[in-house]
Amino acid sequence: MTFHGDAEYASEPDGMSKSGAIGLSRDNVPFSHGRAIFINPVPFKPSSTSSSVYSFKTSFYFVISPRPKNPNPGHGLAFIIVPNDRNDSASGLGYLSLVNRFSNGNPKNHLFAVEFDVFKDKSLGDINDNHIGINNNSVNSTVSKKAGYWYQSKIEGKNRWLFKELKLSGNGYRAWIEYENGKVTVTIGRSQEKPKRPLIEARVDLSKVFLEKMYVGFAGSMGRGVERHEILDWSFENSAKD
């Protein structure tokens, strides 16, 4: 991994991140933000001119923890796929170390992200202070949903789908993100067992977002509210042939 901004790998308990976790921001520094990027680029298209995009899937366990003496949340973290392993003048606050107010929405960003947001920023179109969203080249999500998962329960002899909200701030969860044939699914749960119904299922055209090779990792940021943003484990694979 390469680390940018305030992100780091905590090999020892240091007050910022749990031992062995990837920390994306410093929980004692307001407005802290950073990125942790896998060191090698990953192929996402057969060629630079191809309109085909390789399918991919990733799973990770994350924890967002506000400090006890400063319970204000801010702002969240994101799984990211980006064109390089630098931070490129990205900003904190609601920009989540993805873009800044000048670059937000620029198609040249070549950015795909799934955000786990714990602060409602009206100027960026956030639906609430506890949501998950899909972002292309922008922190303004193309689709977002209240954080939680679907489960089935038998009611009056019939199986019904019920929704359970999950509070992102102050808890740890496992997330699954998958892309295949132009469709992105995002699922979140409390355990290793993946819920059968995704939280988000959306058609997303990544053919113009992705370059032939991209970098994969995480980003996180804070405002005046301070909290830990940690990744405790992570797996990623795609359909590209070695």
From Swiss-Prot:
It holds the Pfam family Lectin_legB. Residues 3-237 are annotated as: Legume-lectin like. Keywords: Lectin, Phosphoprotein. The modification Phosphoserine is found at S207. The keyword Phosphoprotein applies. One of its GO terms (molecular function) is carbohydrate binding. The keyword Phosphoprotein applies. InterPro entries: ConA-like_dom_sf, L-lectin, Legume_lectin_dom, Leguminous_Lectin. It comes from the Eukaryota. Belongs to the leguminous lectin family. This is Lectin-like protein At1g53060.
